[in-house]
Swiss-Prot record:
Heme b binds at residue 88. Residues 2-142 form the Globin domain. This is Hemoglobin subunit alpha. InterPro entries: Globin, Globin-like_sf, Globin/Proto, Hemoglobin_a-typ, Hemoglobin_oxygen_transport. Involved in oxygen transport from the lung to the various peripheral tissues. It comes from the Eukaryota. Keywords: Acetylation, Heme, Iron, Metal-binding, Oxygen transport, Phosphoprotein, Transport. The modification Phosphothreonine is found at residues 9, 109, 135, 138. The modification Phosphoserine is found at residues 4, 36, 50, 125, 139. Pfam families: Globin (PF00042). One of its GO terms (molecular function) is oxygen binding.
Length: 142
């Protein structure tokens, strides 16, 4: 999947609107993932799974940092996310389907917070971007 110039512009615009809330929003998306897909909790046995948990907020910030890195390097995601892909494939052994679950909840969370700025075009571009990000993160499983 290739992102068009319009997709890249839309993703950058949406992520800039997220701004300083990126960690909180990604923490919320992770929390939604845990609620919607309980088996995803198995990767975090030490977490407190309540809303506002410090562990979920901390992991949310890590996710936000990874998304920010991906947004900044959309033209070479494979290189930018290589270490993260290695970590998830070889060390953490995260089931690849979990990336799709999280990406779905990222879209839900961003839609709920961006309101009218979450246009159909932004939605489509973010969906493509997150699918590409998931593909890169699971590329080392093969």
């Amino acid at each position: 999947m290739v992102l068009s110039a319009a997709d890249k512009t839309n993703v950058k615009a949406a992520w800039s609107k997220v701004g300083g809330n990126s960690g909180a929003y990604m923490g919320e998306a992770l929390y939604r993932t845990f609620l919607s897909f309980p088996p995803t909790k198995t990767y975090f046995p030490h977490f407190e799974f309540s809303a506002g948990s410090a562990q979920i907020k901390g992991q949310g910030q890590k996710i936000a940092d990874a998304v920010s890195l991906a947004v900044a390097h959309m033209d070479d995601l494979a290189t930018a996310l290589s270490a993260l892909s290695d970590l998830h494939a070889h060390n953490l052994k995260v089931d690849p389907v979990n990336f799709k679950f999280l990406c779905h909840n990222v879209l839900v969370t961003l839609a709920s917070h961006l309101g009218k700025d979450f246009t159909p075009e932004i939605h489509a571009s973010l969906d493509k971007f997150l699918a590409l990000l998931s593909t890169v993160l699971t590329s080392k499983y093969r």
